[in-house]
């Protein structure tokens, strides 16, 4: 039995009452990206999702997916595991415990690999197993256990599910306001109504995080105001603009930095901590740069080709030349007048949702066409841009 440890709101208070949080992802919330997120305003970060069996059994796997470097600004940190065996998950969690503040159980992954491996959201029909996993970690780990879930179509079932997980011992419950079927082209709009319902019906001491519909920095505050949650996670939104965690009152040019500056800052973090040869830190570098550069790649296709064909994921030195090429190109565009103050982001120029119009040379959210899976059987809802879950004429979705 583990010694007495903080739980629930006491634990949340101890780690600084985080409100702006980098969500767990598959591969893409690795060490240098977490540092970038923290320097961009994130109060708490999750690790990528790790496979509990492989993490517990294979030192080679651990070295490939997780850096044990001691970096003060890396805390607080929650390490997330997927799996379906309480003993195996406990073994992995005990190995991770010295390097984090809590361990999270992934109950939300909707991907095919999770279905095949019987983990993530594909455990949500097996409440007894979930309860046994949470209870095992809660009673035998030296640090708290948390959980991240998706919602059910029936709000009452979502509430009962949340109560079961909390009763089993979860200190924090992160709720992605989408169904298991809402993924890929069918990501759709996250349901803030259900998250608000959980806040109203769970005990006040419950620490609740929300996930979904975070496109811009101001969406974090809107979500907290609308749902009443303690903190908000951003996954995909943070990949396209790490500054999403900054206070929304920050200058627009700070909230939406130039793409070349953002890419250079990311590469400099890898250099600063001498991670050029760290396998786990380089695994997602090409994907990160593609997302940061997305607004301009359809215009400057040679840069896209250079990044796609001229860069080797595990060879750090192949990436700086692409960023240098990008910087040179933007300087040339400035000289030609294609980039100038008149065309830049302004407080006075808003889109139909009330967000700033961002030019192609600045990082910005990815607007995905909205397709809702038939399984949801929901009617369209309308909400204004200053309250509620971003639904009015929204031709977009983002995690």
Curated annotation (Swiss-Prot):
Known role: Catalyzes the synthesis of dihydrouridine, a modified base found in the D-loop of most tRNAs. Also able to mediate dihydrouridylation of some mRNAs, thereby affecting their translation.
Compartments where found:
Nucleus; Mitochondrion
Q: Which residues form a coiled coil?
A: none
So where's the catalytic machinery, residue-wise?
109 (proton donor)
Q: What is the lineage of its organism?
A: Eukaryota, Fungi, Dikarya, Ascomycota, Taphrinomycotina
Pfam families this protein is in? Dus
Q: Does the keyword Oxidoreductase apply?
A: yes
Q: Which GO terms describe its molecular function?
A: flavin adenine dinucleotide binding; mRNA dihydrouridine synthase activity; tRNA dihydrouridine synthase activity; tRNA-dihydrouridine16 synthase activity; tRNA-dihydrouridine17 synthase activity
Residues binding FMN: 24-26, 80, 148, 176, 211-213, 235-236
The family database entries (InterPro entries) matched by this protein are listed as:
Aldolase_TIM, DUS-like_FMN-bd, tRNA_hU_synthase_CS
EC number(s) stated in the UniProt entry for this protein: 1.3.1.88, 1.3.1.-
Q: Which UniProt keywords apply?
A: Flavoprotein, FMN, Mitochondrion, mRNA processing, NAD, NADP, Nucleus, Oxidoreductase, tRNA processing
Q: What is this protein called?
A: tRNA-dihydrouridine(16/17) synthase [NAD(P)(+)]
* Source organism per UniProt: Schizosaccharomyces pombe (strain 972 / ATCC 24843) (Fission yeast)
The protein's required cofactor(s) are namely: FMN
């Amino acid at each position: 039995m583990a010694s007495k440890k903080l739980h629930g709101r006491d634990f949340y208070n101890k780690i600084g009452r985080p409100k702006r949080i980098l969500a767990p992802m598959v591969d893409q919330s690795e060490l240098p990206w977490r540092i970038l997120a923290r320097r961009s305003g994130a109060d708490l970060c999750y690790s990528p999702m790790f496979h509990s069996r492989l993490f517990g059994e294979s030192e080679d796997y651990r070295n490939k997916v997780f850096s044990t470097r001691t970096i003060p600004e890396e805390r607080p940190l929650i390490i997330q595991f997927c799996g379906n065996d309480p003993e195996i998950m406990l073994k992995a969690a005990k190995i991770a415990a010295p390097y984090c503040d809590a361990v999270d159980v992934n109950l939300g992954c909707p991907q095919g690999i999770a279905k095949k491996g019987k983990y993530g959201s594909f455990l949500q029909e097996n409440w007894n197993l979930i309860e046994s996993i949470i209870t095992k970690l809660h009673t035998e780990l030296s640090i708290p256990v948390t959980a991240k879930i998706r919602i059910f179509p029936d709000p009452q079932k979502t509430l009962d599910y949340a109560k079961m997980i909390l009763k089993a011992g979860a200190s924090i419950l992160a709720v992605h306001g989408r169904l298991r079927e809402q993924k890929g082209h069918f990501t759709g709009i996250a349901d803030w109504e259900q998250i608000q319902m959980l806040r109203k019906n769970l005990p006040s001491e419950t620490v609740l995080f929300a996930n979904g519909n975070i496109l811009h920095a101001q969406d974090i505050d809107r979500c907290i105001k609308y749902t009443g949650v303690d903190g908000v996670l951003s996954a995909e939104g943070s990949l396209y603009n790490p500054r999403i965690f900054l206070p929304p009152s920050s200058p627009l040019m700070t909230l939406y930095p130039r793409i070349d500056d953002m890419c250079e800052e990311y590469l400099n973090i890898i250099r600063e901590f001498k991670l050029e040869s760290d396998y786990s830190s380089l695994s997602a570098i090409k994907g990160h740069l593609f997302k940061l550069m997305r607004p301009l790649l359809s215009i400057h296709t040679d840069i896209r080709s250079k990044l796609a064909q001229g860069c080797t994921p595990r060879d750090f030195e192949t990436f700086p030349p692409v960023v240098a090429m990008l910087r040179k190109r933007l300087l040339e565009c400035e000289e030609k007048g294609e980039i100038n103050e008149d065309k830049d982001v302004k407080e006075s120029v808003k889109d139909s949702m009330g967000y700033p119009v961002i030019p192609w040379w600045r990082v910005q959210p990815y607007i995905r066409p909205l397709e809702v899976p038939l399984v949801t059987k929901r009617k369209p809802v309308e909400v204004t841009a200053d309250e509620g879950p971003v639904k009015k004429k929204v031709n977009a979705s983002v995690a």
